[in-house]
Amino acid sequence: MGKKQVRPPRALPPVPSAIQDDIPLSRPKKKKPRTKTPLASASSEGLVQTAVHRPPEGSEPPTKDSIEHQEAPVQRRQKKTRLPLELETTLTQKKTASPSLLPNENGINVEPDEEPVIQKPRRKTKKTQPAELHYANELGVEDEDIITDEQSSPEQQSVFTAPTGISQPVGKVFVEKSRRFQAADRAELIKTTEKIDVSMDMKPSWTTRDVALSVHRAFRMIGVFSHGFLAGCAVWNIVVIYVLAGDELSDLSNLLQQYKTLAYPFQSLLYLLLALSTVSAFDRIDFAKTSVAIRNFLALDPRALASFLYFTALVLSLSQQMTSDRIHLYTPSSVNGSLWAEGIEEQVLQPWIVVNLVVAVLVGLSWLFLSYRPGMDLSEELMFSSDVEEYPDKGIKVSS
């Protein structure tokens, strides 16, 4: 009774495997390999427990309380293995903060020396929740971002609404002249622009096609006039010849004396009118299609007949040009150096009179043929009309 009862030393609870992984006992530099089988880890835990928790000799066997303390950590270890890694680390820190008391030789409970605890470096895992909260805060709606209709309505009216007042024109305007802007009166500027517009309307632009078409139509009008004038001149010429020659060409010397002054002028005029009339008649025929022109002539087309008769009259008139020269140079046979000998007047003049008669008849018939349809011109339709098609049947086939 007088002696204080000495309590037996308390055995340390077994350290769980998860805690041993994080906190080494005596060798801080030694790291436990991660790739271990469950059997090897269990055997190592058993050896550590026997080495650490062996009671000293001469001590009493462990009591019921100590046994309960030894069994309790086992159950806790089984539960802790199911917990996540963060909770295990917090539990180990709590246990290390409150170590159990160890009895010394005198039987007094003494706190064990704190062993250096070296924690294993842990990998930092990315925390997704703070990031989500950060983005959620950024996407939050603030009061400044909310715009009411009352605030936006005056701004929209000031920017987009048109002025209600009527704009008044300014008296002076600035016009760029020689790379400089000069002030000018609006009324004078409007007058000058109106004059320019009127002049542009009065002078339409002409193309080469328009000029060619106008020239062609003007020449056709001249040709129509030459046809009638040539027919009249030819008839007048033959009438004058027969009047001056007398009955049955009995007075040819009188014809030579009276007609020699008219031979050159009249023959020149007749030749000019025949040339114009022949070209004008040919313009009315489509010579681009030779077969069509020959077919029209054989079918007695008035335009084809007129062109042929004019060409024949022109050739006959040129064939009698030498006789006209001799008539112009007529002198009596009694005069020295005369081109007309005695008795040859009838031999020279008779063919000339017949040719002039034929020319008058041909010219008159041609004028009658062309006067039937004076506006008909196939050359104009071919050259200047875009609606004329060379092969209408083929065009229909291609379009189909």
From Swiss-Prot:
Report the membrane topology from the UniProt record.
Multi-pass membrane protein
Lineage, top-rank taxon, reads Eukaryota
Phosphoserine, modified sites: S17, S43
Recorded hits in InterPro entries, A to Z, give: TMEM237
Q: Where is this region: Disordered?
A: 1-112
Q: Which UniProt keywords apply?
A: Cell projection, Cilium, Cilium biogenesis/degradation, Membrane, Phosphoprotein, Transmembrane, Transmembrane helix
Looking at the UniProt entry, the stretches that span the membrane are 221-241, 262-282, 297-317, 352-372
Q: Where is the composition biased (Polar residues)?
A: 97-107
Q: Name one GO biological process term.
A: cilium assembly
UniProt-annotated location(s): Membrane; Cell projection, Cilium
Q: Where is the composition biased (Low complexity)?
A: 84-96
As for family, the record states: Belongs to the TMEM237 family.
Summarize the subunit comment: Part of the tectonic-like complex (also named B9 complex). Interacts with TMEM107.
Kindly provide the name given to this protein in its UniProt entry. Answer: Transmembrane protein 237
Give the species this sequence originates from.
Answer: Bos taurus
Q: Could you read off the lineage of the organism from its UniProt record?
A: Eukaryota, Metazoa, Chordata, Craniata, Vertebrata
